[in-house]
Amino acid sequence: TGKWYQNPDGTYYVNGFADIDGTTYSFDKKGYMQTGWVEKGVKDYYFNEDGSYDPSKKRPMIALTFDDGPGEYTETLLDTVEKYNIHVTFFMLGQNVEGRESTIQRMVKLGCEIGNHTWDHPEQTLPNMDLDSVMQEFQKTDDALVKACGQASTVCRAPYGAITDEQMSAVGKPFFMWSTDSLDWKLMDADADYNQIMNDSSLGDGSIILMHDIHEPSVKCATEKLIPALIDQGYKLVTVSELAEAKDVTLQSASYSDFWDSSLQAGRVAGYAGNSSDSEDSSEDGSDGSDSSDGSDVSDGSSDEGDYSDGSDESDYSDGSSDDGSYDDGSYDESYDDGSEEY
């Protein structure tokens, strides 16, 4: 039970947002007024206990990304993804696809994003390879992904974060760096991984976290500590593309390392990777190195503790009666409670 709104003609607002006497409300498919966070696409809107929309609250978002899989621990990670109903991005190696098709299909089913991390994570950085070889690295992986789950990657990450503008343009997809590096390939300890991430002063709304799902301590950190902690702090965990869309960024064939408000306001979200070719030490198992992202020229992110910041734009709402213009025929009970319901 809950509150609902009856029009003079006996109809009810249902299934969407409605502007009533200058105040915006949200109603579920049964016509009950919604409170708290309400999702509309990839965006979230906050409605007070009286049902009124509060534009001063913005739900902070972070994108968790995992490189070099899929591996033997990926299913454990997906169990947690499913448990908390979150989305993450997997930047996969094509050579690891065969034999783990069901895992990749599960990623897609759970709403995770499929990313391309080349075929075999070549030790030679991409800027030192000819264009045909680079294209083959990404194309072979996409071919394997299509065979495994019926779709190619939507986003890419270069090994060591190193790629030239020409190569990136030829691949023709958005490339993602990161703003917080877990150093999990080096630390190999769940507690240390967690502390490395949470002690990053730039961690906040719009951050992109780099981890690897091929290491057991990394997955243990993510499933037992990091994901629950970020959710407790109020963060919504989304894919990199969802994060971009929520921030009203149209992805291009460019390089992205964060979607902080400071970066958005300064107009420096989309970049080019030609200067980000510093190579890092690679681990013995082929995972990546340690250097931080190319976001060093970006000021640190807001909302370190996951507090809500102000300034969401009320213009996202139309002034119509509801999203789909639908009304109920008034058959619901008229009594109600006053409650609400490695690189």
Task: Give the residues covered by each predicted segment.
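Active-site beta->alpha N-cap acidic-glycine motif
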Residues: 51-129, 134-140, 144-147, 152, ...
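Ser/Thr/Gly/Pro-rich low-complexity, disordered linker/stalk segments of secreted
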Residues: 260-343
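Extracellular adhesion/carbohydrate-binding repeat motifs centered on closely spaced tryptophans
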Residues: 1-59
